[in-house]
Amino acid sequence: MPFTSINYGTCTLPEGRLITKALLETSIKGIGKLHKTSIFPCGIFQCMKGINRKEGEPNYDLFKLALKSTAQRLYPNYANCDWSGNKGYDKNDPKTLFSTMGCRTANGYDINGFGQLKDGRGNICPVTIIMPTLAMETKERNTNSLNQAVLIDEFMNFLDIKIHEAKDMLLERFEWICSQNPKSAKFMYENNVMVGYDGKDIRSALKHGTLAIGQIGLAETLQILIGCNHTTPNGMALAKRIEQLFRTRCDEFKQEYKLNFGVYFTPAENLCYTSMQKFKDKYGIIPNVSDKDFFTNSMHVPVWEKVTPFEKIDIESQLTGYSNAGCITYVELEESIKNNLEALESIVNYAMDKDVPYFAVNVPNDMCSNCGYTDEINNNCPMCGCSNIRRLRRVTGYLTGDYKSAFNKGKQQEVEMRVKHA
């Protein structure tokens, strides 16, 4: 299935408003005779002060319609056009407004001439650092030291080495990709899809894309090093130190190599499970670290933490600013939110005001495959009694079919452990 995303919500022209309204109304209606929730395209509503955030603004009615769609269909997600990390964009040029590619991937400032232009650029190659493994390797090398500060310093040095190794890997992959014949992606290069292409060397286009250094398992890493995660002050302090190292190095690499290195909060749909299995094989079961089948996605608050939507936003918003290649914050809500859109609006606006660049809401989306009844369903449909239930859940920034069949074992467990934030 093609991975597609559509960013919309800021065009105030009659034609643009009609298209946005049609997209949202179609999302709410669903597809086919059973009115299924659409998996793709991933809808992303671009929130922007003066355009759609408050009553009286020209597209506020479309924002309200977007909230209705989110409550019923999980889409759209919300991109923050006022995000501080997108400084220098042109409010009159929609191609520079903050947008994402669905799962969370985003284009930062292009060092090679296009600035905050988003269209025609993409994530050329990513690599992910499995931080809990680094933390355990560091701890094993320091078994004779009881000094926590020494352990942390050793970990930071080790992480720094791995960030440099990640950079070298990306440079090698970038060179290999640039060696490809334009015919390997003929549509992309011959239809002006990729900006900057000179018609000869694909490097002319690819140099405007992102080389992303990602991460997984911040929460478990903190647990290994200091015995708590970033829901605590001590955990957050170390989390910021870790993320600052990622950002500092990526900024340095960007200047040195004149390529768009960026910090990426990796989706890790499969890696969350496979990396944990290898970790368990080597280190066994460690409470609050490997007593489950997955590592926590990037810098997220662990799914089992009992926090409110506002608390989760407060915590993660302190870290999202370190990422310039893509991140997401989402909250888990009860199905009943569809009857309280004012509450949903307050949550989305809170995330935007907290400078979260990309925000999503998870609500149960179960559908009877026999009669089409859609709601949170236990074992059998309350309308017709059928047990063939399609259960959609968000895997990263997008939906991926019934999570019982589309997700791996680790991601299935993560979904089942998710605590409702409201």
Located regions from the model:
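Amphipathic, positively biased hydrophobic alpha-helical segments used for protein targeting
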Residues: I177, L225, V419-H421
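Short intrinsically disordered, low-complexity coil segments enriched in acidic
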Residues: M1-S5, Q215, V263, A406-K411
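Contiguous, well-ordered alpha-helical segments that form the cores/surfaces of helical PPI scaffolds
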Residues: L211-I224, Q244, R394
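Long, charge-rich boundary regions
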Residues: M383-A422
